[in-house]
Amino acid sequence: MQRNPNPNNLPVELNRTSLYLGLLLVFVTGVLFSSYFFN
């Protein structure tokens, strides 16, 4: 599995960045919805 470290690291980093972007998007939408509902 560690024969090609570079091609295996690129998709992992892309998945990590997409995961962080998804969590950030969910967090921002949650804050916006909470502020919209509480106001």
Swiss-Prot record:
It is a single-pass membrane protein. GO terms for biological process: photosynthesis. Keywords: Membrane, Organellar chromatophore, Photosynthesis, Photosystem II, Plastid, Reaction center, Thylakoid, Transmembrane, Transmembrane helix. It is found in: Plastid, Organellar chromatophore thylakoid membrane. Disulfide bonds: none annotated. The keyword Thylakoid applies. One of its GO terms (cellular component) is photosystem II reaction center. The chain crosses the membrane at residues 18-38. InterPro entries: PSII_PsbL, PSII_PsbL_sf. Pfam families: PsbL. It comes from the Eukaryota. Belongs to the PsbL family. One of the components of the core complex of photosystem II (PSII). PSII is a light-driven water:plastoquinone oxidoreductase that uses light energy to abstract electrons from H(2)O, generating O(2) and a proton gradient subsequently used for ATP formation. It consists of a core antenna complex that captures photons, and an electron transfer chain that converts photonic excitation into a charge separation. This subunit is found at the monomer-monomer interface and is required for correct PSII assembly and/or dimerization. PSII is composed of 1 copy each of membrane proteins PsbA, PsbB, PsbC, PsbD, PsbE, PsbF, PsbH, PsbI, PsbJ, PsbK, PsbL, PsbM, PsbT, PsbX, PsbY, PsbZ, Psb30/Ycf12, at least 3 peripheral proteins of the oxygen-evolving complex and a large number of cofactors. It forms dimeric complexes. NCBIfam families: PRK00753.1 (NF001972). This is Photosystem II reaction center protein L.
